[in-house]
């Protein structure tokens, strides 16, 4: 089954990776880059070049909030830290409005030392992303130290998630793009009605 987006979609679909690891050039960042590329490629011609934002470098930059608001797909990545996501990521998420991820498909990525820490971190992260209005249509990309050591190539480590869930991400993005288009059209009509009075 193909996971490429329908050609009927003409809107440019924004894919953004958000890395909450304070360490530069981390494995978490490499996994994020790969997942962003997978989603972008699966969206076909409508998928724009996915950007990666490392919050350690840009967390205080207001343009990051704007980019998050514009994204159709947000890949949110964190290493497990004491059974939860990092304080760096929390600080950024706290700056978003209560519905700051509404009409955004969110793919969490968790890297952890053990399966227990991975599960706890994933639960905490998915909860807060859902509270912010994000759509979480598929399971997270969860990788342990053992997963990453057993497969030198990140593509191999993410392969199982890709095969099982990438099509679900694409379908959800199509629904979000349609919803955004409908909302924008309704807002434009309402604005036109107001200005014509």
What positions do the PLM features span?
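Residue-level preference for alpha-helix termini and adjacent loops
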Residues: 80, 84, 100, 140-142, ...
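Short, glycine-/small-residue-rich phosphate/pyrophosphate-handling segment
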Residues: 106-154, 160
């Amino acid at each position: 089954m193909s996971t490429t987006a329908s050609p009927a979609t003409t809107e440019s679909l924004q894919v953004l990776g958000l890395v909450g690891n304070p360490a530069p050039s981390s494995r978490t960042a490499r996994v994020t880059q790969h997942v962003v590329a997978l989603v972008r490629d699966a969206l076909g011609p409508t998928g724009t070049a996915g950007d990666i934002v490392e919050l350690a470098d840009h967390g205080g930059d207001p343009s990051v909030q704007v980019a998050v608001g514009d994204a159709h797909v947000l890949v949110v990545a964190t290493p497990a830290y004491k059974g939860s996501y990092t304080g760096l990521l929390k600080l950024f998420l706290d700056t978003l409005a209560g519905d700051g991820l509404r009409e955004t498909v969110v793919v969490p990525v968790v890297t952890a030392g053990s399966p227990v820490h991975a599960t706890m971190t994933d639960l905490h992260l998915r909860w807060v992303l859902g509270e912010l209005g994000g759509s979480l249509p598929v399971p997270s990309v969860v990788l342990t130290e053992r997963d990453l050591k057993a497969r030198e190539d990140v593509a191999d480590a993410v392969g199982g998630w890709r095969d099982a869930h990438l099509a679900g991400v694409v379908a959800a993005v199509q629904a979000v793009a349609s919803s955004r288009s409908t909302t924008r059209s309704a807002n434009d009509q309402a604005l036109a009605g107001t200005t014509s009075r």
